[in-house]
Amino acid sequence: MNPRFEAAWELHIFLTEHHIAYAIIGGVAAQHWGEQRFTQDVDMTIATSPADDIEQVVTLLTHRFRSRVSNPVEFARLRRMILLTAGNNVDVDVSLALPGYEDDLLARAVDFVPEIGKAIRLCTAEDLIIHKTVAGRPQDLSDIQSIVFRQAEKLDLTYIREWLRQFAEIMEQPELPERFESAWRKRTAA
């Protein structure tokens, strides 16, 4: 099995044992929904709530997986991220989900089977597009285009556009939806 899938499977087992909902986001999901490309790590988001004790969540994860930062609790409080290393030395970036949009992302996640008998949870193509549109880095924009080309008519455009509209408003970035719309126009013009 691919080392990133091995790391994702290891996290899947642990999170499932602890009844923590999760979804793989980032490059691993982009490979599934878009084109194959190189990625060195695994990105995921896990279910948390404002009432969750961040220290407790961080301690649970860092008791099993090695932290890549010296003070993981403080790092998680500041960035809502936990930087871990799986048993096979693959880096895993764990985002602590916020209520609202990420509740939808986790509820909509789908099973992906990289190897018979081993299913991991991936965010949907729509949610990956939303994540990558908000991030807006050059690789993200390339991923959006490849997902649009590959998934095309399967995409729930209403869902994507509504969440991007909300993020544009919250982030005060009215140009945000255009990152997706540009990719969509290129697809239909091809």
Where are these regions (language model features)?
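Compositionally biased terminal segments of proteins
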Residues: 1-190
